Amino acid sequence: MDRDLLRQSLNCHGSSLLSLLRSEQQDNPHFRSLLGSAAEPARGPPPQHPLQGRKEKRVDNIEIQKFISKKADLLFALSWKSDAPATSEINEDSEDHYAIMPPLEQFMEIPSMDRRELFFRDIERGDIVIGRISSIREFGFFMVLICLGSGIMRDIAHLEITALCPLRDVPSHSNHGDPLSYYQTGDIIRAGIKDIDRYHEKLAVSLYSSSLPPHLSGIKLGVISSEELPLYYRRSVELNSNSLESYENVMQSSLGFVNPGVVEFLLEKLGIDESNPPSLMRGLQSKNFSEDDFASALRKKQSASWALKCVKIGVDYFKVGRHVDAMNEYNKALEIDKQNVEALVARGALYATKGSLNKAIEDFELALENCPTHRNARKYLCQTLVERGGQLEEEEKFLNAESYYKKALALDETFKDAEDALQKLHKYMQKSLELREKQAEKEEKQKTKKIETSAEKLRKLLKEEKRLKKKRRKSTSSSSVSSADESVSSSSSSSSSGHKRHKKHKRNRSESSRSSRRHSSRASSNQIDQNRKDECYPVPANTSASFLNHKQEVEKLLGKQDRLQYEKTQIKEKDRCPLSSSSLEIPDDFGGRSEDPRDFYNSYKTQAGSSKTEKPYKSERHFSSRRNSSDSFCRNSEDKIYGYRRFEKDIEGRKEHYRRWEPGSVRHSTSPASSEYSWKSVEKYKKYAHSGSRDFSRHEQRYRLNTNQGEYEREDNYGEDIKTEVPEEDALSSKEHSESSVKKNLPQNLLNIFNQIAEFEKEKGNKSKN
């Protein structure tokens, strides 16, 4: 109930309306509380008395008051109140949403006096007025009003109503200029009502927007053009030129009147609900009628009856087999009524027969939504779901098939086809899971077997590789022994044949001395070898590998020193006496000094692995060196035999010399033969490192003195110099000097290992003596 509107009505009509409302609306619970407060004095402004000069027509309209009292529950209801916000009328005039007409009094020929009184009665502060400047004074300017810019539309152009705009209400357009200098007489001004004197009919206006209400504050005040005048004023001017036009003709000629959305626009502007419009006629109130009596429900019934006719025609086509025509009729029925259940069920059945199960399921589900109690729709939907589940089961989409079966059971729990299909699917899924598990176990076993077989293969390959290495070692050792034997036999045969051809006086001169030395050296060497075999003990396990590695380093160090000195002597010897240089290359097969220290290192490695054997490539190198020096060998084979025998005697003499100065410590190697050979070679390198250059220089001097003598005498002198020129004191000093230099060059850990080995050998020797 709109209490403000009721209070205004009671203030206007007085106590007579109040008594009528009490008698008519006594049963209305809303009016009981309101009428009690309405009887009190009104809180609003006091009722306005008729103005002086107005004719007294105080006739109480009892019929209007009776009408208000009878329709009070409808007139003062909140549904009549406008909910639309107040908008600017100036902006709406520019758009022809509805027919905008001239003021009504222009067609009614109302006297100017009455129109003037009505204007001053209805005008309020904040209303917008439009006029022309008539005069400009120092305190402001006067303007004659021609129309209203807001509120009620009035025809005031001929009433000559003036308004004053004071200087304080005129905004300045420059900082130091006169604000009134901007305006001229005849300018059209839009201003807001600031003050009203209804008794003297005087108005004061302002050009500041602060004088306007909030909903009109956006309107521009000041000078405007004729095009900005309100639309109703322009049409009233046109009507004055042609006064014969009627109100109806003007309304129909306007563009907004023929607008198709004019009703919706006006209802929205007035705040009236279109779906539940209020009416003052009791019989037309919407609450007094049922929903089936309204147009929307009647339209649905009508469209449903038309759709059923199309469905019947489509069913007839379907029975005959004309599926295309049946589908067209079903689609036509659904165009008329989109939610027609029968049309949806019939079209779904047609889709199912064609094989489009998904479309059929959609139609059946939509039919069940519109009518949940439709039996055929439920039945057909369950059957279609089971059929679709079977298709998915064939495609091995078991989870989707299971969901379709469950949907069918949710719609109808007694549907046996869906229940049986679901049980079969569960059994099949269990079997498939078991098979997958078994297959996974088999794959795991196969993987483990593959891993085991690969490991076994690797083991076999390693064993085979070890076996092949052993075979290769045996073959290399046997080949080296055979090659050494062959080389010795070949050298002995060649030397014997060449020795026969040698001259007799040379052989008789040197044979006696050499034979005596050979026998003595052989006897002493055999005795020393026997003693070494008796005194040799195995090396401790924890020092053998490291000692061998360090021993090889020692041999490399000694070999470098010997190689530098020996290469110099070899170059000089080869340049001056090719025969002696070729004879010096022969001892490589018998453990003598070689030209390259790497040969000594290789011979040491092979002799440590297998006793009494040498590398086969030494003999090959021996024969290759012999082939390289064949130019000097082939000249005289007797010279070769003589040099070979002389070298044997040289070796035997050195053995005797080494046995005299040999220390008591035992040589450390894996076998006695290899240890003896390695010790001899090391001692030989030590000795040659200090005395080789001196011996060779002495030999070179003798070689120069005896150049005119025979070739055989030079060789004898060379052999005898090697055997006899080294005294015992020089040998001892050179040996000590070489050992001290090696010890200085060796690292501390290697020296410690040598000391431990020497102590170990001493302990073994003491135990054997005891």
Swiss-Prot record:
Residues 626-635 have a biased composition (Polar residues). Residues 126-208 form the S1 motif domain. Belongs to the TTC14 family. This is Tetratricopeptide repeat protein 14. It comes from Homo sapiens. Keywords: Isopeptide bond, Phosphoprotein, Repeat, TPR repeat, Ubl conjugation. Residues 498-508 have a biased composition (Basic residues). Residues 476-497 have a biased composition (Low complexity). Gene3D superfamilies: Nucleic acid-binding proteins, Tetratricopeptide repeat domain. The modification Phosphoserine is found at S671. Residues 590-599, 612-623, 690-703, 711-742 have a biased composition (Basic and acidic residues). Residues 36-56, 439-458, 464-550, 569-635, 690-747 are annotated as: Disordered. TPR repeats lie at residues 210-243, 307-340, 342-374, 382-415.
